[in-house]
Amino acid sequence: MDQSTGQTITLPLREYLIGAVAAEMPVSWPDEALKAQAVAAHSYALYRRDHSTEENGAWFTADPVRRQGCLTDAVLHSYWGTAYTANYARLSALVDAVQTQVLYYEDAPAGTSYFAMSNGRTEASEKVWGTALPYLVPVDSSTDTAADNYEYTLNLSAAQLQQLLAERLGIAAGLPFAAGAVVWHAGAHSLRLCG
């Protein structure tokens, strides 16, 4: 489902894989890395097909406009500009080479979730989704700490934070906030905002 429009869209596998790889990785990255991402995206899509609880029939959500999940052809055109033809040809060839490959666990497509970076160590699946998957266990990811945008600062006033909490999470505005800074050192499991 396209999060920005609320519409359920259906894409041919090849188009989905090209858009999914483009959403997750720079097209300039090594061939084998891009092919591995295509296999992970294919496996994840099939896993979501088999485990989706979406009432609208969608396997999962994406937001092409924000370049998340899968990029549509129109978004790829605007994102790549004059490099569209060359980039699309490159990704197409790499996707074509692995389009039939899927990762399985116990005779079913594996839930090969992926993300841009972690805090130096990945998290166990049960801490993220509440379900233990034996192949999604914590591993070292310390090279993430050298990535661009690994660390950044965002300053919000109490009023701005209250507005965002109300708009995005439906948390009532006007709750009292204590002064002080929140510093994220590792994955936060909870954060007390008020009281």
Stretches found by the model and what they are:
Residues M1-G195:
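Conserved, single-site charged/polar hotspot
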